[in-house]
Amino acid sequence: MLSLVVSNSFAQDKADASAAPKMSELLGNNSVYQYKTEPVYDPKSNKSFFFWMGKTGDIYGREYNHETKAWNPSLSQDSKKIMEFTRTPADRHNYPSVVMAPNGHVLVLQEDHLGSKDGYALMLYTSPKPGSIDGEWSNQTLWTEGQPSYPTAVAAGDSIYLFMRRKVEFIWRVWQFSKSDDHGKTWTEPRTIVDTENKEPDNLNEIYSVAKKFYDPVNKRIALTWNLAGGKDHNELNKDLYMACLSTTDHKMYAPTGADLGEKVDLSEMQDPNTKVMVLGTEAQDGEKTGPIVDYTHHANYLEDGSFFITYNNMSKKNGKQSLMSAKWTGSDWKHSVIEEKPFQEALTRYGSVQQVKGSHLRVSIIDDELFKVRIKETKDAGETWTQVCEEVFDTKGQLLNCADFIFPYRPGYPQILVGTMPSKDKHDTKPKVDMPIWAMGDGSQK
């Protein structure tokens, strides 16, 4: 197992690679609270692309050439400003979401998460040429009504599927999708695919399906996981974990059992024990004071036999445990397994993201908040056993680690993860006012 303390020096890109396995490099000190990041790898150009939000909301980025092992811009230079987006202060919801278009252009989505008096919008930025961040990016506004938020997109064949949340009422928010068949130039009208229809008894009528989605090319489907939030106030309480699939053939929703759920999943279908859409039923827990019980970070992958494999957090103050978990679909039900577990406390150990290496070989990133540490664990038997690959301690300059997101799709070698920070004084502050560091992290291999 490899362990290394990272120094905040731009000179790291000049270090002798033969001295030790490359573990991390500082990409910039111009980041703010990243809710999440979505680094991507492009096999055509053999480059990985990294983007983050700056203090005023501007989007910055760098690309890594795996053949030359060089950064663009080099780490001795400032990162490239992809798009100017001045909001003072920035809002953590305005993080960049990234997808490679089928034609090789890099697409970056950004929401404008403002107060209702200012309105909301969802923007799309497109690289001027394939496989590169160089040049002046184009900018188009996709939607402004219904407060479009938490965008994430996935390429499926020659199409791109964009998922987002829309607001119906203050504590009634639904999940939608839109499709582009021309590399992001035009989009279908968004359609609701998950909706409680404002019928949840405790007013938990907000859908959260924030994490990155993955496409199953064999069965032509995209799995979505989500949890419920709401209560007396917006996002006050949080509970449950659900999963269903959007078919890219007929655009219907399907349960894990294969049951046809129609154009959208409603509350009765979520809670029907026969559909197995509910992966985990939980108590309602106060997300601000104790951390959401299933967090907002949960992903669904597909194993060789087509079964689903979900990774998620389960932080129960009532049960006194914080657990990093997996759930495997057996063909008739969900089998839950512990990745690791410890007593519940304020300084959380959190699951960050997942990377499918191949089939039953998967990796997860784990964040130890106040230890300033990110770890990688892996399983080669679909969650039966887990071993630690490496760990990294970061010099955060007093901030807390917030996100550790794998590059998608998997490519062996350096780098593997984009690591971001959040305010140490108030981790629920949505509008941090200081610059924070952001890094690329490896797994100790240098291929």
Predicted features and spans:
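Extracellular, repeat-based ectodomains that mediate carbohydrate processing or recognition
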Residues: 13-447
